[in-house]
Amino acid sequence: MMSLCASKLLPNDVTLAMHLQKLKYLFLALFLWQCSPSEQYEVADNPLDGGRYFIENSMQGNFKKAKLYIVEDAENLALFDKIASNYYGLDKEGRMQIRLASIQINEITEVDSTITIMNYQNSFDKEVHKLKIISTPKGWKVDLKYTYGPNL
């Protein structure tokens, strides 16, 4: 019976420890690659996309991604947290109905070149909502203060 020995399988100037070191770095690189975020943030190039990305991600329960599409200030973040809390306060069936609902955009009103108002509803609750979408250096983002404030 033939026995295999590491010294017969490897060239004279390469040690088993060197190969194990290479394997260790390969596995480390693969691990770090897998840990990197796989979801890419898609910048909203227009107000319709900004509003739609926010609404879709909110309805799907993906609040981490939906948060990327709001104007980040203290009041907006507080309103956003309330929206997420209300969503997770629903039972499993209620959340599923929202996830399956479709978005119906009723009207888009361009106030000026940097502000647009989107009037929409979803097929689940059929309640009309308005979003103010603002052009920012990081794309078009939703200002929740308009939706939940006295400006309506």
Task: State each model region's role.
Residues 43, 48-49, 53, 58-111:
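Short solvent-exposed beta->alpha transition segments
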Residues 100-152:
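Exposed beta-sheet edge and beta->alpha loop/turn motif
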Residues 33-34:
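C-terminal motif of bacterial Sec signal peptides marking the signal peptidase cleavage site
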Residues 21-28:
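Sec-dependent signal peptide recognition
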Residues 8-17:
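Short, Lys/Arg-enriched N-terminal segments with co-localized hydrophobic residues
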Residues 1-2:
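Intrinsic disorder/low-complexity segments
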Residues 37-42:
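Transmembrane signal-anchor/signal-peptide helices with a preference for the extracytoplasmic
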